[in-house]
Swiss-Prot record:
<dbReference type="GO" id="GO:0005740">
    <property type="term" value="C:mitochondrial envelope"/>
</dbReference>
<feature type="repeat" description="Solcar 2">
    <location>
        <begin position="187"/>
        <end position="280"/>
    </location>
</feature>
<feature type="transmembrane region" description="Helical; Name=6">
    <location>
        <begin position="351"/>
        <end position="371"/>
    </location>
</feature>
<dbReference type="GO" id="GO:0009941">
    <property type="term" value="C:chloroplast envelope"/>
</dbReference>
<dbReference type="Pfam" id="PF00153">
    <property type="entry name" value="Mito_carr"/>
</dbReference>
<dbReference type="InterPro" id="IPR018108">
    <property type="entry name" value="Mitochondrial_sb/sol_carrier"/>
</dbReference>
<feature type="short sequence motif" description="Nucleotide carrier signature motif">
    <location>
        <begin position="315"/>
        <end position="320"/>
    </location>
</feature>
<keyword id="KW-0496">Mitochondrion</keyword>
<dbReference type="InterPro" id="IPR002067">
    <property type="entry name" value="Mit_carrier"/>
</dbReference>
<dbReference type="InterPro" id="IPR023395">
    <property type="entry name" value="Mt_carrier_dom_sf"/>
</dbReference>
<feature type="binding site">
    <location>
        <position position="315"/>
    </location>
    <ligand>
        <name>ADP</name>
    </ligand>
</feature>
<feature type="binding site">
    <location>
        <position position="157"/>
    </location>
    <ligand>
        <name>ADP</name>
    </ligand>
</feature>
<keyword id="KW-1133">Transmembrane helix</keyword>
<feature type="repeat" description="Solcar 3">
    <location>
        <begin position="288"/>
        <end position="374"/>
    </location>
</feature>
<feature type="transmembrane region" description="Helical; Name=3">
    <location>
        <begin position="185"/>
        <end position="205"/>
    </location>
</feature>
<feature type="transit peptide" description="Mitochondrion">
    <location>
        <begin position="1"/>
        <end position="74"/>
    </location>
</feature>
<keyword id="KW-0677">Repeat</keyword>
Length: 385
């Protein structure tokens, strides 16, 4: 499940496995005591919460922590500030490349996922029939460049998210520093969920409004009946101005609570499934096989993401009501109304596009990292969701 804040995407797994960066190495140096699965080494967030913090995204708990100060971000001790800054910026470029490459399918996912809210608000003429229909209509009505609408906010979100990862890291590591072999599986598992929820929510608190703005821009369709085909928002700043004017700060954080719950749900499913299935399937020659481990991680990531996808749908549907006359009273009210009026399948609209997005981004990021190795002599990961 967050652009989804944040859950590991396939592209982040690929870069984490095949192309481990200096950024990820520094982060792992500060990582929590519990060892993560091989396919989950990369600091990231699954697409639904991304960035994230949810496609955050959200950030893996063992990778979010703090320096001594909750305000200032300190570079790892063994690296000079200059090298750290270069890694940080290059990680941003890498994140921008992967996010921009996947932006068209990401917008299609959001359009399909939130189309019922757009129909109710009179901002969509008729429902989309599928991924191909959504692509075709969007290009026909708005032009091919519109497929990247909302991508700027998604790229910008990387930088505060990455800084917050360092800002919150050590604090939550000290609070939930349980070891699986010493404290037992269930205590480690509970600590992992708690640290993930606390760290994810803390980071998400600062970047959630960017995810909100990205969602509103991506779903600002030009083919609407309302407004004679004109867009509702003229850009990122306009989203903030109009939302604050109509709904205040609360409008920027609609769906925040259910987003935090989504972190716990996803992490519980991911780690629970991985720890349960890996000892059974990855035995013998498969135990040390990268491809077998990657395939298992890919299946579990998408399985956990699909199971937690309804949470992402509810939070984004709640986002879409900011500025509208009728709003959901709560996340439970949103869930109940969606199921009652549209059926349970409506909670999974856009899930297929969400999987395709991860596949599309994987090859692009791997290729980009290979280019970095040739040009710079080292690889930089995206570092964040």
């Amino acid at each position: 499940m967050v652009e989804q804040t944040q859950h590991p995407t396939i592209l982040q797994k690929v870069s984490g496995q095949l192309l481990s960066s200096s950024v990820s190495q520094d982060i792992r140096g500060y990582a929590s005591a519990s060892k993560r699965p091989a396919t989950y080494q990369k600091h990231a967030a699954y697409g639904n919460y991304s960035n994230a913090a949810f496609q955050y995204p959200l950030v893996a708990a063992s990778q979010i922590a703090t320096t001594t100060s909750p305000v200032f971000v300190q570079a790892p001790g063994e690296k000079g500030f200059t090298n750290f800054a270069i890694d940080f910026m290059m990680g941003g470029v890498s994140a921008a490349v992967s996010k921009t490459a996947a932006a068209p399918i990401e917008r299609v996912k959001l359009l399909i996922q939130n189309q019922d809210e757009m129909l109710k608000a009179g901002r969509l003429t008729e429902p989309y029939k599928g991924i191909r229909d959504c692509f075709g209509r969007t290009i026909r009505d708005e032009g091919i460049g519109s497929l990247w609408r909302g991508n700027t906010a998604n790229v910008i979100r990387y930088f505060p998210t990455q800084a917050l990862n360092f800002a919150f890291k050590d604090y939550f590591k000290r609070l939930f520093n349980f070891k699986k072999d010493k404290d037992g599986y269930w205590k480690w598992f509970a600590g992992n969920l708690a640290s993930g929820g606390a760290a994810g929510a803390s980071s998400l608190l600062f970047v959630y409004s960017l995810d909100y703005a990205r969602t509103r821009l991506a779903n600002d369709s030009k083919s609407a009946k309302k407004g004679g085909g004109e867009r509702q928002f003229n850009g990122l700043v306009d989203v903030y101005k109009k939302t604050l004017k109509s709904d205040g700060i609360a409008g920027l954080y609609r769906g925040f609570n259910i987003s935090c719950a989504g972190i716990i749900v996803y992490r519980g499913l991911y780690f629970g499934l991985y720890d349960s299935v890996k000892p059974v399937l990855l035995t013998g020659d498969l135990q040390d096989s990268f491809f077998a481990s990657f395939a298992l991680g890919w299946l579990i990531t998408n399985g956990a993401g699909l199971a937690s996808y309804p949470i992402d749908t509810v939070r984004r549907r709640m986002m879409m009501t900011s500025g509208e006359a009728v709003k959901y009273k709560s996340s439970f009210d949103a869930f109940s109304q969606i199921v009652k009026k549209e059926g349970a399948k409506s909670l999974f609209k856009g899930a297929g596009a969400n999987i395709l997005r991860a596949v599309a981004g994987a090859g692009v990021l791997a290729g980009y990292d290979k280019l970095q190795l040739i040009v710079f002599g080292k690889k930089y990961g995206s570092g964040g969701a």
